Amino acid sequence: MSLAVVTLKKGEGRLLKSGGLWIFDNEVASIMGSFVNGDIVLVHDFDGYPLGRGFINTNSRIVVRLLSRDENTVIDEKFFEKRVRDAWEYRKKVTDTSSCRVIFGEADFLPGFIVDKFSDVLVVQSLALGIDRYKEMLVELLKKVLAEDGIRICGVYERSDVKVRKQEGMEPYKGFIGEEFPTLVEIVENGVKYQVDVKDGQKTGFFLDQKYNRLAIQKLCKNARVLDCFTHTGSFALNAGYAGAKEVTGVDASHLAVDQATANAALNGLSDSVKFICEDVFDLLPKLEEKGEKYDVVILDPPAFTKSRSSVKNAVKGYREINLRAMKLVKDGGFLATCSCSHFMDYQLFTQTIGQAARNVHKRLRQVEYRTQAPDHPILWSADESYYLKFYIFQVCSDR
């Protein structure tokens, strides 16, 4: 059976030819042949030159997600096994694989498919219609590849409970893939223990992308007074406590997150030095300033303030506000760790926003480190969306 052919408009396809993996609806001139959304189609430029093959979905702004640049590639189980195997071999070289992101969508050439490994449990996100057809196969292939290294997976949980699926014509979904299992999973990262709630925690249950950024703050925290804002389940706060901080306060607006963070502190024997409070960070920081509170280290790990270009302006205001408030709470010569996980808040804009915040409160910033996401979340240079996490550590000094 012949595949449908997507032909691009004249002059379109430049991003695709330079390594991009997405074709948007406004780039398409015509679609010839019969297909059902989620099928594999061929892609040609305006002159009929073949550009590859991928999944089609005319319900989405991303009409085609490319799988291969060779239009003769057979997309079958053997094809997917190689992609899965390549992803795992890469992780074995670049990171501690006890808990890690095993598959990172487009950056592993498996568009829309994400898998996090927490000890012996896999958590899956399926974000695109085409890949959704293959998720059970991909899970079985991954279990097979891991088994070859002596890793037995005891359970798989799907966390596709995200709004982006609606843009693909799918409903959000979460549930077990295969047999049920206890959904609180204990992991160890940087020497710190966590209970990860893969069923009800945020996203897949734990933010593995900050692994080495959490490690980076440990050296600053011995005997320090630390404030960790947007703490979620306490990961930065617990790294500070593990490193010997004398007093750590973690703040989050979610009661569920604070309860889990408190349990994680107890799990590590840090309940005396690491405490958590449930409050909105934007409300709390001015109160702390009014009380004259000062900290050796302040950490800002907020959720994405923007998930589209249209809301970037408001996001800038939010990032500027929390950063200038945080700088006021840092002792002269103390440290600020600050980050953004929004792809649309790019490096340059984030840097400018922090600089503006520092000028507004008459602070000098001495950059200690600039970091991004952990290497199990690889940045594919031809896929801008794979680069999203910006993480700075600054020494904060008065400019007076």
Enumerate the language-model features and the residues they cover.
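Non-catalytic substrate-recognition/targeting regions of SAM-dependent transferases
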Residues: 103-116, 135-206, 215
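Conserved class I S-adenosyl-L-methionine
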Residues: 223-232
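C-terminal catalytic and target-recognition region of SAM-dependent MTase-like enzymes
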Residues: 335-400
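Conserved SAM-binding motif I beta-strand of class I
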Residues: 247-252
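Non-catalytic accessory regions of SAM-dependent methyltransferases
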Residues: 1-119
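Conserved SAM-binding loop of SAM-dependent methyltransferases across substrates and taxa
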Residues: 233-246
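S-adenosyl-L-methionine
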Residues: 256-299
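S-adenosylmethionine
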Residues: 281-359, 371
